[in-house]
């Protein structure tokens, strides 16, 4: 499906006026990819009684997991909006471009959380505390090694990366990247503690409080930092 959609993009998308065709191809490829999974569901799924379903008892735990995501999205949106209000739309644009590049690197660092979460959950469910500690120590060492290397690597090339990706008018993105590269290590450690420890060990309340508290502190500090340093204060 992916190869077919890629071929159609090269064949049918010729210039900027073909945006509609491009959107249709992407939508059809997504639908087609999902439809290819349906024939296999008959082997995996079994019939169940509707009376045996109790969706409401899962609602509160699900909401508690959803709150940190809401808090994170709110303060990310407020970062850009506050920067646009206090420092102008240009600074908000520079921040957005810098943040996009950092998120690409962060995707590699935080991917370990997706891998480690089921392993730590399984060990904790079996009462294997020693194994949980071992997994977390190994993960912390790996994430630290990877994140610190990426932080210094990104900071080293940040001066040229902004203009290389976005053009000569995006010089301020370079310094913003250099400053923001620090969060690669901080978010990497946060991922180990939050996603790989607090969530698997059923300490969702502690995880939620830490994320919400961090979001509130970030919003409060934004006022003086953005007022004094503009783009670099928001970063």
Show which residues each predicted segment covers:
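Alpha-helical transmembrane segments of multi-pass membrane transport and lipid-handling proteins
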Residues: 35, 133-189, 216-223, 227
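Short helix-kink/termination motifs in transmembrane helices of multi-pass secondary transporters
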Residues: 7, 62, 66, 70-82, ...
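Interhelical loop/hinge segments that connect adjacent transmembrane helices in multipass membrane
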Residues: 16-26, 32-76, 115, 119-134
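Helix-loop junctions and terminal segments of transmembrane helices
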Residues: 98, 102-140, 144-147, 194-200
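Interfacial/gating helices of multi-pass transporter permease domains
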Residues: 19, 57-65, 83-103, 130-131, ...
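Short runs within selected transmembrane alpha-helices of multi-pass transporters and secretion channels
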Residues: 1-6, 22-39, 68, 72, ...
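Helix-terminus/linker motif at the lipid-water interface of multi-pass membrane proteins
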Residues: 11-15, 73-104, 122-123, 159-169
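Helix-capping/transition residues at the boundaries of transmembrane alpha-helices
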Residues: 12-14, 84, 121, 198-199, ...
């Amino acid at each position: 499906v992916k190869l077919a959609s890629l071929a159609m993009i090269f064949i049918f998308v010729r210039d900027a006026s073909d945006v509609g065709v491009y959107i249709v191809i992407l939508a059809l490829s997504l639908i087609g990819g999902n439809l290819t999974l349906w024939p296999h569901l008959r082997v995996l799924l079994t019939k169940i009684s509707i009376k045996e379903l109790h969706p409401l008892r899962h609602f509160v735990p699900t909401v508690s997991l959803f709150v940190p995501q809401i808090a994170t999205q709110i303060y990310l949106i407020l970062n850009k909006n506050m920067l646009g209000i206090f420092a102008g739309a240009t600074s908000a644009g520079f921040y957005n471009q810098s943040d996009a590049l950092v998120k690409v690197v962060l995707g590699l660092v935080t991917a370990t959380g997706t891998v480690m979460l089921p392993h730590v959950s399984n060990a904790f469910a079996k009462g294997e505390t020693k194994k949980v500690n071992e997994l977390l120590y190994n993960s912390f060492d790996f994430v630290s090694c990877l994140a610190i290397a990426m932080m210094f690597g990104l900071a080293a090339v940040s001066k040229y990366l902004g203009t290389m990706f976005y053009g000569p008018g995006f010089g301020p993105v370079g310094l913003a990247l250099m400053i923001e590269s620090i969060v690669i290590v901080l978010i990497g450690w946060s991922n180990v503690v939050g996603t790989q420890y607090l969530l698997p060990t059923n300490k969702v309340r502690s995880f939620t409080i830490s994320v919400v508290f961090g979001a509130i502190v970030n919003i409060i500090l934004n006022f003086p930092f953005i007022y004094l340093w503009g783009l670099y204060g928001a970063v």
